[in-house]
A protein has these predicted regions:
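Glycine-rich, flexible loop segments associated with nucleotide phosphate handling
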Residues: 7-12, 159, 246-252
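Generic alpha-helical structural element
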Residues: 15, 19, 101-105, 178, ...
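FAD/FMN-dependent oxidoreductases across multiple families
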Residues: 99-220
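Short secondary-structure transition/capping segments
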Residues: 30, 89-98, 169-177, 241-259, ...
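C-terminal helical "tail/cap" subdomain of flavin- and related membrane-associated enzymes
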Residues: 190-319
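Long, contiguous hydrophobic alpha-helical segments, chiefly transmembrane helices and signal peptides
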Residues: 16-22, 26-30, 46-52, 79-82, ...
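A structural signal for well-ordered alpha-helical segments within the folded catalytic domains
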Residues: 24-28, 109-110, 183-187, 254, ...
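Predominantly flavin-linked oxidoreductase catalytic cores and closely associated redox partners
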Residues: 1-118
């Protein structure tokens, strides 16, 4: 190790845990030594913009209103509010990378505010009489789902080296799963280290348990990315005629999905089940094995389309 401007120091350890995040340099260093690390990488095709705000003196956080949610998806824009401490909060806006005109406009902080105030669920937070900005609008791209394999054909690329969290597996940050998957992954590693002493066996079992615990989360996130990409591209072509599901199976899935969204707004049992998935307290969709969730969701069949739509301007109105 070498501190900036200081002397180099050698540290010896039984194991190395790489928690360096998505930009960890250890992967490239291993590759430079000849290691083969295979990676699954999928582009989310979005640009992520945010701006930070603070509530004005005497203004309280808006009450949560299902009719005007502070998070949502208009197809061409995804948005969300992230409350902080002391009246501070952030607003995020995600736009498909090919929406060049919209992306150019939203870089301007005043335009960012105008767009946010045109969305009822955000205006409740960022209206001129509610909050003031504490930063300009800023963004980042290169948003990918990635899975790096440190075991290939049951052969570890390195012994006593363990990548955890985003250094090994990451999903679209829009879903807010990074900290949770990192914690799950760390517990998986701790258990492996406690149960197994062989460096080789530790690597193999850690890889297997990573697949068991994180692959369902990764697949669900990736599927959501693909759906969002398809919807955004379709709206760029013709937002007045969104794609309709083809085939009886897809139509039924869409019908049930609309009912599920409506049920999470109006049935506490369904909401609790959905939140267990959202907060990664169980594997994605596990709550759907509860017959009560199915039964209660079916009551909303045919009632979950229009009522679940997020209020906001059309793409044409924004442009």
């Amino acid at each position: 190790l070498k501190q900036r401007g200081g002397e180099s120091e050698q540290l010896l350890a039984d194991i190395v845990v790489d928690a360096g995040g998505r930009n960890s340099k250890q992967r490239d260093r291993l590759r430079d030594t000849g290691a083969t690390i295979e990676s699954e990488v999928d582009d989310a095709e979005i640009i992520y913009y945010t701006r930070h705000y603070k509530l004005l003196p005497g203004v309280e956080e808006p009450e949560r209103d299902p009719a005007e949610p502070s998070t949502g998806d208009l197809g061409f824009i995804k948005f969300g509010v992230f409350p902080g401490d002391g009246g501070h909060f952030a607003v995020i806006v995600c736009i498909h990378r090919e929406e060049t005109e919209l992306l150019e406009a939203i870089r301007d902080s005043e335009t960012y505010d105008r767009i946010c105030r045109s969305i009822p669920g955000l205006n409740r937070w960022v209206a001129e009489d509610k909050a003031e900005a504490t930063t300009g609008s800023f963004g980042f791209s290169d948003i990918h789902a990635a899975w790096h394999h440190y075991v290939t054909d049951k052969k570890p690329v390195a012994l006593n080296y363990f990548a955890v969290g985003d250094a090994a597996v990451r999903t679209n940050p829009l879903y807010g799963r990074g900290c949770s998957t990192g914690i799950i992954h760390a517990h998986v590693l701790a258990k492996v280290l406690d149960e197994i002493s062989s460096p080789h066996d530790r690597a193999i079992v850690f890889d297997q348990r990573t697949e068991e615990e994180l692959r369902p989360i990764f697949k669900a996130s990736l599927a959501d990315d693909k759906k969002a990409i398809k919807r955004a591209r379709a709206m760029m072509v013709d937002e007045t005629n969104p794609p309709t599901p083809k085939g009886a199976r897809n139509r039924l899935q869409t019908l049930f999905g609309n009912a599920m969204r409506e049920a999470t707004r109006k049935d506490i049992h369904v909401l609790r089940g959905a939140m267990r998935t959202v907060n990664l307290m169980e594997k994605p969709g596990e709550f759907m094995k509860d017959w009560r969730v199915i039964a209660r969701t079916l009551r909303f069949i045919g009632r979950g389309d229009g009522g679940s739509r997020v209020l906001g301007p059309s793409r044409g109105e924004i442009l």
